[in-house]
Amino acid sequence: MTLTFSSSAATVAVAAATVTSSARVPVYPLASSTLRGLVSFRLTAKKLFLPPLRSRGGVSVRAMSELVQDKESSVAASIAFNEAAGETPSELSHSRTFLDARSEQDLLSGIKKEAEAGRLPANVAAGMEELYWNYKNAVLSSGASRADETVVSNMSVAFDRMLLGVEDPYTFNPYHKAVREPFDYYMFVHTYIRPLIDFKNSYVGNASIFSELEDKIRQGHNIVLISNHQSEADPAVISLLLEAQSPFIGENIKCVAGDRVITDPLCKPFSMGRNLICVYSKKHMNDDPELVDMKRKANTRSLKEMATMLRSGGQLIWIAPSGGRDRPNPSTGEWFPAPFDASSVDNMRRLVEHSGAPGHIYPMSLLCYDIMPPPPQVEKEIGEKRLVGFHGTGLSIAPEINFSDVTADCESPNEAKEAYSQALYKSVNEQYEILNSAIKHRRGVEASTSRVSLSQPWN
């Protein structure tokens, strides 16, 4: 339902060798750190704003209700803007079924109506209905006040964006910049995920380091976050846990993302709200032999794009070099960070080192699988079953790990590559165990150690 940043990272190993300093790809600036409303239009000097959503344990129902109510005026504004440009906006012919929904029955009957009209494929309609019930059960389990209203308002907007994506499919470029207007997809994702996070049982490890990252980025340094990957909600969890202290991080992070998040109709609206470096997953590279060459060329373009961005400096890139989401131990049921692909780590390191700008690599750990647990095994087909839950989440970062410090005694490049990857993985795993103790074993900040200090920056 939201973003799957899975096996994209392993693809770095496939294409990085082709990235050269001669690449000439447009450089995209960092997104603004200003929190905007969900809908805005550049018609005049005046913009239409909705209030930023800052609730700690729940969602602003009023803001989402206003979003639905303001869609009529947004369509009118879009018409005016596009008529001036001589264009016909997709919103003109867009069905209002979900925009007009005010109840659960309206939403469910709307899915049926759109499917019968041929505007929703049967499999997409079935996935939307399943998602509705799973999301509703998760939000209601939070015990938040007006949870029913939250579900209807959030799902009406989500369904509207999914339907629009089917009617007028969005095409992602190798580097996709988060769409912030006229519809603010970034805030849309936050509003949707926020009610699923139990902030009372969520923690950030070494929060001060994230503030240091922001300072370095503003000075033109490149930062790469090497972490595990747990769920489709990972990018939103990172942003929401840092929202009170470091909103700059959430808005400017660029995620190396697999192709499935930009093709699944239920994922695409959420993907549109993130900065993505889009690649084809190594795990799915050979699903269709006829497409292998096309996928490799596309990955080369994406890696050139990344190299160009790094040369401009001031970049924040998140990559999960395991090549996919973590899975539980089949024997014990315990979750743990999946092992890293050493080649992916090494190629990312070389891209940073050869960029010409100061660069730093930090190990980061995520614990949030209960929010949207992945299927037990990697699936070939698009359209996985999406479970949703209300749970505590965790995010932790450790100090930078320097390649030369770790590999000083290594006797070969191969040994050095493996040693560096293992050093990063060891740190991620150590942080994960501390987050697990705090959240799953309910130890809270008492789970802190000399290396990982847990806190709740939103309190």
Curated annotation (Swiss-Prot):
Pathway: Phospholipid metabolism; CDP-diacylglycerol biosynthesis; CDP-diacylglycerol from sn-glycerol 3-phosphate: step 1/3. GO terms for biological process: CDP-diacylglycerol biosynthetic process; phosphatidylglycerol biosynthetic process. It comes from the Eukaryota. Its EC number is 2.3.1.15. Pfam families: Acyltransferase, GPAT_N. One of its GO terms (molecular function) is glycerol-3-phosphate O-acyltransferase activity. It catalyses: sn-glycerol 3-phosphate + an acyl-CoA = a 1-acyl-sn-glycero-3-phosphate + CoA. Keywords: Acyltransferase, Chloroplast, Lipid biosynthesis, Lipid metabolism, Phospholipid biosynthesis, Phospholipid metabolism, Plastid, Transferase, Transit peptide. Belongs to the GPAT/DAPAT family. This is Glycerol-3-phosphate acyltransferase, chloroplastic. It comes from Arabidopsis thaliana. The lineage of its organism: Eukaryota, Viridiplantae, Streptophyta, Embryophyta, Tracheophyta. The gene is ATS1.
